[in-house]
Swiss-Prot record:
Keywords: Cell membrane, Endonuclease, Hydrolase, Membrane, Nuclease, RNA-binding, Transmembrane, Transmembrane helix. It is an enzyme of class 3 (hydrolase). PANTHER family: RIBONUCLEASE Y (PTHR12826:SF15). This is Ribonuclease Y. Belongs to the RNase Y family. It holds the Pfam family KH_1. GO terms for biological process: mRNA catabolic process. The lineage of its organism: Bacteria, Bacillati, Mycoplasmatota, Mollicutes, Acholeplasmatales.
Length: 526
């Protein structure tokens, strides 16, 4: 059909075949080159991944080594601190053991001395008894001789003669009896005084108050005189609002840069003081702000009262205490007696009573508890009728306190006789705290009244010539009439004055009564 040149066709076919083969070869080589490139890239990627893995492993290794070193350092530090604490504990235990050993040695030495003293005293008593027996025998012999003599030479009956002889014998040995009584009384007083001094000195060495208790401050300082006008407010509305909310009178007078707060309740006075201080510092003073600040101050005071009571309970270690009693203790931080802070005084009495109890083998914790609560009635004595003693007894009875605590409260001012050793110790600790120099201040009027009363009591006793109160009322020196009072009467006068002072006066500590009998003979040489 078609006229095709055979050689040309063959040539064309060969060209096509050759081209196809060439294209296939070119494609093959291109594919091989691409494959090699892919392998090379994959190899490079693998090498990069391996290198990154090595770097990450190396970094992780370094971090783990660092953390391990830090943990080792921390453990070593904790171990060193633990060793240090254990060493300190061991040192403290050794120190306590040494102190305990020293105390036991001192106690042993004291007991040895006391035993020697008791043996000597017993020996003296035996000697005195033998002397008295001898004197008694002599007196009996003398009486018999006198009876026989009088019966033979007198018409007196036996009974009349005996009465006459006994009167003579009484007169002859009265001086000896008085001397014996005086010696024994002085000896007993000396032993009791030395023992009491030792116990009290040990107790006071183990506890001493840090500072003299402060007075309650009722003066608020203000920056300038203009602030007084702002406190008063327009038509006095600010000061009226503050007085109505706090129950305290504000006295704004000519005192420079100061406002005086006057109120019977110390807690209210402290609330007013804090509120006024905040208002003065803030500068915004108006009825709304005053109400807000007073409420804030009242909340702060309530919190402070609770914390103060809890701190007192914790410090004295008296055990579990009812929350209401804790609050009453906290209120006493704003109460003062003769300038002495009542809460600090109660803490001081608690420690002193505890130390005294420990020295004589009584319950130390119970003594501290009684000492801490002994003035609890002063927390509300301005709100409730009655003395702080009766209020305290009622409160402690209501909260089921131990009978020793109630007894200590009832008797620490001598209103009733103490029924337990704890009550006696609390009264002694109370007197120690009150009599400590600087603990209390006393007005001049009451001081002079006490000295005058002391001299009047002494002068009222029969046979007294003059009496002088000396040593700030700690001693009364009495001069007696020598013609009316003999040596035996000195003891009776001293005892009478002592009993009257104890019955009629209230005083801290003790009062020494010294009675002096002096007889003078004078003449004039011409």
């Amino acid at each position: 059909m078609f006229n095709v040149d055979t050689p040309a066709l063959i040539t064309f076919i060969l060209l096509i075949v050759v081209g196809a083969l060439g294209g296939a070869l070119v494609g093959y080589f291109i594919r091989v080159a691409q494959h090699e490139k892919s392998l090379r890239l994959a190899r490079e990627e693998a090498e990069r991944i391996i290198e990154d893995g090595k770097k990450e492993a190396d970094r992780t290794k370094r971090e783990m080594v660092f953390e391990a070193k830090q943990e080792i350092l921390t453990l070593r530090k904790e171990f060193d601190e633990d060793i240090k604490d254990r060493r300190q504990i061991v040192m403290n235990l050794e120190e306590k053991a040494t102190q305990r050993e020293n105390a036991l040695n001192q106690r042993s030495q004291y007991l040895d001395k006391r035993e020697i003293g008791l043996d000597a005293k017993e020996e003296r008593h035996n000697e005195r008894k033998e002397q008295l027996d001898i004197q008694y025998s002599k007196v009996e012999e003398l009486i018999k001789e006198q009876e026989e003599k009088l019966s033979s030479i007198s018409a007196l009956s036996r009974e009349q003669a005996r009465e006459l002889i006994m009167a003579q014998v009484r007169d002859s040995i009265s001086n000896e009896i008085a001397a014996y009584i005086r010696d024994e009384e002085d000896n007993a007083k000396s032993i009791a005084q030395n023992k009491s001094k030792e116990i009290l000195s040990l107790a006071m060495q183990k506890y001493a108050a840090e500072t003299t208790s402060e007075r309650t401050v009722t003066v608020v300082e203000i920056p300038n005189e203009d602030m007084k006008g702002r406190i008063i407010g327009k038509e006095g509305r600010n000061i009226r609002s503050l007085e109505a909310l706090t129950g305290v009178d504000l006295i704004i007078d000519d005192t420079p840069e100061a406002v005086v707060l006057s109120g019977f309740d110390p807690v209210r006075r402290e609330v007013a003081k804090r509120a006024l201080t905040i208002l003065v510092q803030d500068g915004r003073i108006h009825p709304g702000r005053i109400e807000e600040v007073v409420e804030r101050a009242r909340t702060e005071i309530d919190m402070f009262i609770r914390e103060a009571g809890e701190e007192a309970v914790f410090k004295t270690g008296v055990g579990k205490v009812h929350p209401d009693i804790i609050k009453l203790l906290g209120r006493m931080t704003f109460r003062t007696s003769y300038g002495q802070n009542v809460l600090k005084h109660s803490i001081e009495v608690a420690f002193l009573a505890g130390k005294l109890a420990a020295e004589i083998g009584e319950n130390e914790m119970l003594a501290r508890r009684a000492g801490l609560f002994h003035d609890i009635g002063k927390a509300i004595d301005h709100e409730v009728e009655g003395s702080h003693v009766s209020i305290g007894v009622e409160l402690m009875s209501r909260y089921k306190e131990p009978k020793e605590v109630i007894d200590a409260i009832a008797s620490h001012h001598g209103d009733s006789e103490p029924e337990s050793i704890i009550a006696v110790l609390v009264a002694a600790a109370d007197a120690l705290s009150a009599a400590r120099p600087g603990a209390r201040s006393e007005s001049m009027d009451s001081y002079m009244k006490r000295l005058t009363q002391l001299e009047e009591i002494s002068n009222d006793v029969t046979g007294v010539d003059k009496a002088y109160a000396i040593q700030a009322g700690r001693e009364v020196r009495v001069m007696v009439l020598p013609d009316k009072v003999d040596d035996l009467g000195l003891i009776n006068i001293a005892r009478t004055i002592k009993e009257k002072i104890e019955a009629q006066m209230t005083y801290p500590g003790t009062i020494k009564v010294t009675v002096i009998r002096e007889k003078r003979a004078t003449d004039v040489a011409k």
